[in-house]
Amino acid sequence: MKNKKNFLVIGNPIKHSLSPLLHNYWFHKNKINCEYKKLKTTQAEIKKILTKVRKKEIEGINVTIPFKNSIIRHLDILKGDALKTSSVNTVYLNKKKLVGENTDVYGFSCGVIKKVANRIKTAGIIGAGGVTSSIILALIQKGVKKIYITNRTFSKLKIFKKKFKKIIYPIKWNDRYKLFRDVQILINVTSLGMLGQKDLKFDFSIFDKKINVVDIIYNPENTRFLKDARKNGHKTF
């Protein structure tokens, strides 16, 4: 078929991504002449991929781990929440400029946060990856006043403290159980538990069952993290 428009999601790993299945279903259902593929990518290959976007060989790309931050140096313009988070998951060409946007904030707000926002004032985050700043911004926009965040490499948390100031409370990995007791929602933003990755092991037995537990991983749908939370009586998303 002539003039087919091509779209792509890039990442590493990328096997877990269901984006092509979702997008191609709607393209076919609505008789839109487009195709969406996934590509395992290295940092060195990103510039070459973006050159294809500039040439309109690729109409646009989605970006997943671990490139949501590092791709920014290759772009001309950041818009909306991408400016606030320094995290990009969508790239396209507009007036000969490569534009980076962030739909992660909106997606998380419309999904999980919308269901629990009225009663959430304190949150805990596990992980310091490319989507972390998007989750933080979504929480702030919904009125969360205090966010504890932990990561095995403590130094990686400094960037979030610098960007979001007093609302962020970085905590050392060994202190996570003690300080997370005060949160109302606990969110895993690491890749642990993803298809092909190691599980995230977490002891929920010391936590109040009223704490909502979230895992941003969607493949598999039921991660070890969520299963363990449900065993302890937590509501999971």
Model-inferred region functions:
Residues 203, 211-237:
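Rossmann-fold NAD(P)-binding glycine/threonine-rich loop
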